């Protein structure tokens, strides 16, 4: 491993020390809590939407979240290891077959829906106890 990769890994470890980032992929619905500075005050604002892209590039990793706000599509790109991101919560897993969901930009209503994934990678089954 060269020295640049080692430095980058140390930076990622330092930035993720206080928070846990769940494993999410395109198609998943996430709630990103972002620290917003307004004058002298700082507050946390929630941004919930569908992940339409994920760029895995070490320290420069980012993800794009799309939501519909007052009938208008809004996309926001978040750096994964940004100190402005307070937390990321996984709301639901989506069942998609693409890595980039840019085609959702041209769709509205029912055609823009994503089916929920209930089994497979990243899904943990809850034990309901013994039946019978």
From Swiss-Prot:
Disulfide bonds: none annotated. GO terms for biological process: translation. Keywords: Ribonucleoprotein, Ribosomal protein. Belongs to the bacterial ribosomal protein bL19 family. This protein is located at the 30S-50S ribosomal subunit interface and may play a role in the structure and function of the aminoacyl-tRNA binding site. PANTHER family: LARGE RIBOSOMAL SUBUNIT PROTEIN BL19M, RIBOSOMAL PROTEIN L19. This is Large ribosomal subunit protein bL19. It comes from Rhodospirillum centenum (strain ATCC 51521 / SW).
């Amino acid at each position: 491993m060269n020295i640049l990769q080692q430095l980058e890994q140390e930076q990622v470890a330092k930035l993720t020390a206080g928070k846990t980032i769940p494993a999410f992929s395109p198609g998943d619905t996430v709630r990103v809590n972002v620290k917003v500075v307004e004058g002298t005050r700082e507050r946390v604002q929630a941004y919930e939407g569908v992940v339409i892209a994920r760029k895995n590039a070490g320290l420069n990793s980012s993800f794009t979240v799309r939501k519909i706000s007052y009938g208008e599509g809004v996309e926001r790109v978040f750096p994964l290891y940004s100190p402005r991101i307070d937390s990321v919560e996984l709301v639901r897993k989506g069942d998609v077959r693409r890595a980039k969901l840019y085609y959702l930009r041209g769709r509205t209503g029912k055609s823009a829906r994503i089916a929920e994934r209930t089994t497979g990678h990243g899904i943990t089954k809850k034990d309901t106890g013994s039946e019978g």
